Amino acid sequence: MMKVLVVVALLVTLISYSSSEGIDDLEADELLSLMANEQTRAKACTPRFYDCSHDRHSCCRSELFKDVCTCFYPEGGDNEVCTCQQPKHLKYMEKAAGKAKKFGGKIKKWFG
């Protein structure tokens, strides 16, 4: 078991080292130009409950998570309908994160 942990730690170290070298090789100008290209490539996202059948990866983000394009067949219909929706488990996680953030603010007031 100890050998497995040592091998895993070694692999993680090697991967992080190799990825940091790749970033260091980029010059600042190249990095800025890459970021500028990424911003111009971005397109408008599809709001929640709107049709996303044209591009299933275009759904907007909520506070923490990206909405998912969900497709279904309405009752008695033959046409597939796709809309951007937030899965319930992510909705509950966002609510919990909001409550934790609010509670953290109260604790900060009490002891801050």
Swiss-Prot record:
**Domain of life, per the record?**
Eukaryota
Molecular function via GO: toxin activity
Q: Which Gene Ontology CC terms are recorded?
A: extracellular region
Keyword flag Nucleus: no
InterPro entries in the cross-refs? Spider_toxin_CSTX_knottin, Spider_toxin_CSTX_Knottin_CS
Disulfide pattern: 45-60, 52-69, 59-84, 71-82
Q: Give the UniProt tissue specificity note.
A: Expressed by the venom gland.
Its subcellular locations are:
Secreted
* Chain positions listed as propeptide in the UniProt record: 21-41
Keyword line: Disulfide bond, Knottin, Secreted, Signal, Toxin
Signal peptide range: 1-20
- Tell me the PROSITE patterns matching this sequence: SPIDER_CSTX
In the record, the note on similarity to other proteins reads: Belongs to the neurotoxin 19 (CSTX) family. 01 subfamily.
Q: What is known of its domains?
A: The presence of a 'disulfide through disulfide knot' structurally defines this protein as a knottin.
**Name of this chain's protein:** Toxin-like structure LSTX-D10
